Amino acid sequence: MSAAIAATARPAAEMRTRALYDLPLPELMFRAQAVHRAHFDACSVETAQLLSIKTGGCPEDCGYCSQSAHHDTGVAATRLMDVEAVLAEARKAKAAGAARFCMGAAWRAPKDRDMDAVCAMISGVRALGLETCVTLGMLTPAQVDRLSAAGLDYYNHNVDTSPAYYPRITSTRTLDDRLETLGHVRAGGIKVCCGGIVGMGETIEDRLAMLELLAGLDPHPESVPLNMWTPIDGTPVKAFEEKVDPIAFVRLVAVARLLMPRSVVRLSAGRHTLSDEAQALCFLAGANSIFVGDTLLTTPNMEESRDAVLLARLGLRPAPAQPSA
């Protein structure tokens, strides 16, 4: 589906989504929890850990990102990590209870010369019994084939925001560029991890249009990360950031669950700003995945000890790893 088609989504569908969002909270939560229980174990939460394998120096100008070479954020550019160093971090993640190991590189697109190392990382992490996910930027079909052959389970490539708001966030690529890569990933047999970010000055309508865009992908993404933008000095978005109301975020999670019943909905960046009570509401609304570990690329995350206490308080248990066959 192109961005042009997404931008002209049927008004009736948009009205239905807004009507869901505006339901009295108890009714919205009841509907979302019912759908969630129809497809998932309501007491199981997926745990993933994210490692930046190549930080900073990205040529894209994404207004929310600390790793863009266009912004003065104090993030130093690094080279691609050695394979063994990545595998050492993956072992630590597994020992700490993570079921999926996600690796992110600050590239517009990977160079073919880097693919051998990335594929070795994927194969090595998979050999540890962990699910694998990478986010490397835009891909060619040939690169997708290499990642698939290495055993990659998931590829993350977010749509970021609504089609209408997208040009305000970045100018070095289009939403159609993102959707093209998602098409390559899907055609290559790799599961899709695709979500977005809220709190960048967008409207409620933009947030819901983003969910409509995700729900319009056929099939739905297997994994949908929902991020709350974390303030980063030196980024353009810092000038018009908006703190997301926790209840508004809970509503967004519930609508995501209703629109994409079989997708795993992940509480991603910004989760550390939510109280335990707000996170509990998110789980009731249908969220069933979290990032563990103290950092997400270059931004803070929940402390591991706080996560363990929270899951225990709520009676939730980490889901086991399920690498693709």
Swiss-Prot record:
Cofactor note, please?
Binds 1 [4Fe-4S] cluster. The cluster is coordinated with 3 cysteines and an exchangeable S-adenosyl-L-methionine. Binds 1 [2Fe-2S] cluster. The cluster is coordinated with 3 cysteines and 1 arginine.
Q: Which family does it belong to?
A: Belongs to the radical SAM superfamily. Biotin synthase family.
Describe the function of this protein. Catalyzes the conversion of dethiobiotin (DTB) to biotin by the insertion of a sulfur atom into dethiobiotin via a radical-based mechanism.
The pathway where this protein functions is:
Cofactor biosynthesis; biotin biosynthesis; biotin from 7,8-diaminononanoate: step 2/2
EC? 2.8.1.6
Question: Where is [4Fe-4S] cluster annotated to bind?
Answer: 58, 62, 65
Q: Which domain of life is it from?
A: Bacteria
Q: Which GO terms describe its molecular function?
A: 2 iron, 2 sulfur cluster binding; 4 iron, 4 sulfur cluster binding; biotin synthase activity; iron ion binding
Biological process (GO) annotations? biotin biosynthetic process
State whether keyword 4Fe-4S applies: yes
Database matches in Pfam families:
BATS, Radical_SAM
Q: Per UniProt, which keywords does this protein have?
A: 2Fe-2S, 4Fe-4S, Biotin biosynthesis, Iron, Iron-sulfur, Metal-binding, S-adenosyl-L-methionine, Transferase
Keyword check for Metal-binding: yes
The encoding gene is: bioB
| PANTHER family registered for this protein in UniProt | BIOTIN SYNTHASE, BIOTIN SYNTHASE, MITOCHONDRIAL
| Protein name from the UniProt record | Biotin synthase
- What InterPro entries does the record tag this protein with? Aldolase_TIM (IPR013785), BATS_dom (IPR010722), Biotin_synth/BioAB (IPR002684), Biotin_synthase (IPR024177), Elp3/MiaA/NifB-like_rSAM (IPR006638), rSAM (IPR007197)
> Broadest EC class?
transferase
Q: Whom does it interact with, and what assembly results?
A: Homodimer.
Domain (Radical SAM core) spans 43-262
Q: Where does [2Fe-2S] cluster bind?
A: 102, 133, 193, 266
